Amino acid sequence: MKNRIVFLYASWVVALIAMLGSLYFSEIRKFIPCELCWYQRILMYPLVLILGIATFQGDTRVKKYVLPMAIIGAFISIMHYLEQKVPGFSGIKPCVSGVPCSGQYINWFGFITIPFLALIAFILIIIFMCLLKGEKSE
């Protein structure tokens, strides 16, 4: 039981940090999110609420709702990161108006961009959900 709570709690903390980081970049640093950033937000923000409730109730059944959202979010993050870093992918135009998806507001150590941070968060959530091993809540 304790391991389940630890993995749920860790997933919730990751989602919460990702959401707060996203809000920091847009509201404090005034970075305008592109279209793909919005899709990643749409998939990450509800995870804070879903995982928060599941954590405090000790409900591991939430895995079946969280995993699809995290996997889709990871794929969007990968596509976004490739568009930023690989010249061949920059021809893909998912962003039709506003801020270009190929723009890089941050580029820490030459490879850490905002989509990369989102990808790490989604991957950590996927790993923690997989470590729940399908245990049922009582």
Swiss-Prot record:
Disulfide bonds join 34-37, 95-101. It comes from the Bacteria. It comes from Bacillus subtilis (strain 168). It is a multi-pass membrane protein. GO terms for molecular function: protein-disulfide reductase activity. This is Disulfide bond formation protein C. One of its GO terms (cellular component) is membrane raft. Its main location: membrane. It is found in: Cell membrane; Membrane raft. Keywords: Cell membrane, Chaperone, Competence, Disulfide bond, Electron transport, Membrane, Oxidoreductase, Redox-active center, Transmembrane, Transmembrane helix, Transport. Belongs to the DsbB family. BdbC subfamily. GO terms for biological process: establishment of competence for transformation; protein folding. Required for the stabilization, possibly via formation of a disulfide bond, of the obligatory competence protein ComGC. Not normally required for production of the secreted lantibiotic sublancin 168, although it can partially substitute for BdbB when the latter is absent. It may also be required for the stability of other secreted proteins. Not required for sporulation. Disruption phenotype: Cells partially restore cytochrome c oxidase activity in a CcdA-deficient mutant, possibly because the bacteria can no longer oxidize the two heme-binding thiol groups in apocytochrome c. The chain crosses the membrane at residues 5-24, 39-58, 65-82, 110-132.
